[in-house]
Amino acid sequence: MVLTLPFMVAVQEISARIGRVTGAGIAGTLRAHAPRPLLLAIVALLVVANVVNLGADIGGMAEVARLLAGGPAWVWAGGFALFCAVVEVWVAYRRYVLYLKYLTLALLAYVALLFVIHVAWLRVLVAVLVPHVALNRAALTMLVAVLGTTISPYLFVWQAAEEIEDMQISADPRPLRERADGGAEIARIDADTWGGMGYSNLVSLAIIIGTAATLHAHGVTDIATPAQAAQALAPIAGRFAELIFALGVLGTGLLAVPVLAGSTAYALSETMGWREGLERKAGDARGFYATIALATLLGAGIVISPIDPMRALVWAAVINGAVAGPVIAAMVVLGSLRSVMGDYVLPPWLRWFGWGGAALMVAATVGMLVL
């Protein structure tokens, strides 16, 4: 995870710059400059992966709520889905974004878990700095899945879209390519991206270390739901660790569901030419908000289907990882064109790490397919 941080930062910053400089999202920019069949294929895979992710997240929250408070999981799933959809549709962006920012603090539950369990920190340090990856299909599939959760197309779409939302409610709502004083905005994007991706990487490492030091170390490797993971922690690390993990699942789900549904709506709306934006009223962006509601509903439906949510989550991450490489390459090309970015074309370091990130994702995907 530490070694992928520069690629994560580069890709998210490229996404943010495209949105803020052009005033168009990732799908909207691809629609204007890329072949339509490529755009439709990318968006179709994004929608499928997002809906499966929504189902896994809603199902995870429901199972944890059942563990903590009792009651049928499907009732909790419906309640969480309804709450997330209603809040995202009816709360204005400028207020809603504050809710999401404060909710990221819930992710610290996974970091707190490390302080209540035993961790062999020397072994962790060696493994982090010198990671070992077995060159077989199973290992490379998991590598693509892990990369697909951190360098993921839905995050590209969301990052660019939120830059546009912020721009439209700012004192000067013009895209940067129409302004000559964009240096401060670029610096702000740079600082925000490094801070956000650093925080994301910290939480991801905490989850990996925490589960490896407890569940995997005690032979618990077949987990069907996050609630089972929380329950399995109790006899190993105590009830407090179980509670912390459970609260982390709830907080993560409440943060992830709106982002997944929102990125689905942004991508589809930009592709179809619909009005979009969380600052718009529901009646002014019907297709956009209908997509949010439908994606969340379909995700909740997975909870009562025979689909194994954890396996589905892994394969959704694999899809994200496989799609990410071509999308990153397209973003680097577009971000390097003066006809698209004006005076704000990507600097060399972003292009280098952008191409490096694309190569990493493609190489892992090809290795997964051919070995």
Give names to the regions the model predicted.
Residues M1-H33, I42-V52:
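Juxtamembrane transmembrane-helix boundary signature
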Residues F7-V21, A161-I169, G198-Q228:
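Extracellular/periplasmic helix-exit of transmembrane alpha-helices
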Residues R17, V21-T22, L39-G70, W74-L82, ...:
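Hydrophobic transmembrane alpha-helices that form the core helical bundles
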Residues R36-P37, A73-G78, F240, L254, ...:
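Loop-to-transmembrane helix boundary motifs in multi-pass membrane proteins
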Residues A41-A44, L68-W90, A106-F115, D284-L298, ...:
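Transmembrane alpha-helical segments of multi-pass small-molecule transport proteins
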Residues G79-F80, E88-H118, I319-A324, L346-R351, ...:
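Membrane-interface loop-to-helix entry segments
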Residues L105-H132, T149-E165, A330-S339, T365-L371:
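Hydrophobic alpha-helical segments and their helix-loop junctions in multi-pass secondary transporters
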Residues W121-A127, A134-M142, N320, A329-V333, ...:
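A generic transmembrane alpha-helix motif of multi-pass inner-membrane proteins
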